[in-house]
Amino acid sequence: METEFDGVITPLKTDISTGDAITPREVRYSFKLMLEDRSIEIWAYNLETVLAEKLETVVSRVTTNTRMRDFYDLHILSQLHGQSIVPADLRAALIATAKKRGTEKYLADAPAAFDEVEADPNMEKLWRAYQKKFSYAADLSWHTVVESIRSLYRLARAE
């Protein structure tokens, strides 16, 4: 979709989902507009559900998940918002997501999945290509990214 404001055309991407398990519930975000003195509010996934959906994808798809953005998102969101993650909510969101997707059986084998992902030369090659395309990821080693994902999983599994 493209938007036009004052003759400037800007591409706009939206991500609309239905039927997902938002756990424990959606949250309202307020965004201050840059060109007007007001804010808009939207309902969106809570942080734990965003993380759970990406984490479940890594666990269930292992090396068939070639979308490096998922790996980057898991790393950067844990770095930027790690202190605000509620472990019980992350655990509940991960279980709800896996149940909705029919992948609950894979959760117990997550540590092995992370090992496989990290050791796979093709995955690391895809990561290097992602780094070249997106400079914000240039200084992040594949090991660092996968270790962040392991840490999130451990947080979700903490009792």
Where are these regions (language model features)?
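Structured mid-to-C-terminal alpha-helical surface segments
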Residues: 1-159
